[in-house]
Amino acid sequence: MKYNRFEELPVWQDAIELAVRVFELTTRASFRRYRSVRDQIERAAMSVSNNIAEGFERGTTQETLTFLYIARGSCGETRSILCLSERLPGLTHLRAEISDLKSKSESVSRQLRAWANSLQNTEIRGQRYLTEKSKRLSKQAREREEFLKELEEIRNRKS
């Protein structure tokens, strides 16, 4: 599937949901006494979606990959702070909610890894490298594939 805007990306949407849920957690009165933990986890959670967006907008596959790895690192940082939080004396009553957030973070991380793996194995260099010639060649290749698919369907109907 082709995405034109980062807001359409399922992984970006999940990363936004992760950040919103982290902010909902950190607005609890229990977090007031852990201000530095709160600030750090909020920054880390926001960084995930922001790096996905920045990488998507960069225009080259290599830059996208770089930012996906940064986003994945921020996802790990978020999860690490969640692990710390569930062990802090004033936050143990939030363990179930924190556990759900850790699962969400792991899901986002898996999506980022899968996307990065798919980009590593592609010959596509990114929008920045598209020329009129490369666009025309790409269009011709797609049309050829569609034509061959139609021929195959016709052959199958005759059989």
Q: Which residue ranges define each predicted feature?
A:
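Amphipathic alpha-helical assembly/interaction segments
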Residues: 1-159
